[in-house]
A protein has these predicted regions:
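Short beta-to-alpha loop/turn elements within the nucleotide-binding domains of ABC transporters
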Residues: 120, 168, 180
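Short glycine/proline- and charge-enriched loop/turn segments
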Residues: 132-142
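Conserved coupling/switch loop of ABC ATPases
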Residues: 166, 184
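Short, compositionally biased segments
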Residues: 181-182, 189
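Short secondary-structure boundary/capping segments
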Residues: 142, 148-149, 182
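A generic "structured core" feature
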Residues: 157, 171-175, 180-181
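Domain-scale signature associated with acetyltransferase and cell-envelope carbohydrate enzymes
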Residues: 1-123, 127-129, 146, 150-155, ...
Length: 189
């Protein structure tokens, strides 16, 4: 039975090497199409990226993405990076994310050596007006939607299925517990 297990594990290792080359190349092309400046990356799985005209995205060295249930069992939405027309996304060096979503409608800044767990959602916008009259009138504009920048420091760990809301600053070395909702800033720690 052991030879079968070893053969299976060897096939899986070969598959992961081939898949990494394929998905990294695919992601580089998607980044290029969207104008994302990225020094170096490694990807496993298909990330969905959309940088609107006028939006900017810059990613440092050593960016690592795992997305899709074939490559990570945590989180189920896949990796999504969405930057609005006036949005700015800045990601530092050695940042890893698994099946996480980042929406930068105004500004999201992520420092160096940050780990973003599966299912994490980082939103700098409410997406819609919180005023029910405006929201239901059919006249809602981008100016009616509340937005505020998010800043995540260096060496931060964001646990699985956490939500980081608009206006939050997370200090260097902080740990965000799995399943938490951050609506207020978190000190260094």
């Amino acid at each position: 039975m052991r030879p079968v297990i070893y053969a299976f594990k060897a096939c899986k290792a070969i598959h992961l090497k081939i898949a990494t080359v394929f998905w990294t190349t695919y992601t580089r092309i998607i980044f290029w199409i969207n104008g994302v400046k990225c020094d170096s990356l490694k990807a496993l799985g298909r990330a969905r990226v959309n940088v609107s005209l006028g939006g900017k995205a810059t990613i440092g060295n050593g960016f690592y993405i795992r997305t899709g249930q074939s490559y990570t069992e945590v989180g189920n939405l896949g990796t999504r990076i969405l930057v609005g027309p006036q949005g700015i996304l800045t990601i530092g060096n050695n940042v890893g994310m698994s099946n996480a979503t980042i929406v930068a409608d105004q500004s999201v800044t992520i420092g160096d050596n940050v780990m973003i767990g599966g299912g994490v959602q980082i939103f700098d916008t409410n997406f819609h007006s919180t005023d029910p009259i405006i929201r239901t009138s059919g006249t809602e504009t981008r100016d009616d939607v509340k937005k505020a920048p998010i800043a995540i420091g260096n060496n931060v760990f964001i646990g699985t299925n956490s939500l980081i809301c608009k206006g939050v600053t997370i200090g260097d070395g902080a740990i965000i517990a799995a399943g938490s909702v951050s609506v207020k800033s978190v000190p260094s720690g």
